[in-house]
């Protein structure tokens, strides 16, 4: 017997108890708070959340009755890891990628971005070391990430 689609329309204000289900989402999927998704065990859910900001790993969602708790997790994605021989070279790479509005995850020694052949060529031409990896992607929110239009 097929389970009914679980409609998630509530963001829980504080992290509650253990979640019943995990919902792995890519960075792009976390920015869209409406639509059909699948939990890690294959249960279909329908997001119908208020448009008040992107979802973050660790956020917990619920149905209107509060009978199900679903925790958002960061899904594994194909990424490029960028390393440089100096902090300045790494900052320059971040600057050039930022000019192209590329989502970046920033660390002291490296940058992560979604895999992209054109950007990989540009970065390699600047002398940066690239490696491909599969891991959750948690990009910076951007200058206006917390801004709400009212």
UniProtKB/Swiss-Prot annotation:
Cross-referenced SMART domains: UreE_N (SM00988)
Pfam families: UreE_C, UreE_N
Keywords assigned: Chaperone, Cytoplasm, Nickel, Nickel insertion
Stored InterPro entries: UreE, UreE_C_dom, UreE_N, UreE_N_sf
Chief localisation class: cytoplasm
Localization: Cytoplasm
Gene Ontology terms, MF aspect: nickel cation binding; unfolded protein binding
HAMAP family, alphabetized: UreE
Protein name: Urease accessory protein UreE
Function: Involved in urease metallocenter assembly. Binds nickel. Probably functions as a nickel donor during metallocenter assembly.
Cellular component per GO, a single term: cytoplasm
GO biological process: protein folding; protein-containing complex assembly; urea metabolic process
Record family assignment: Belongs to the UreE family.
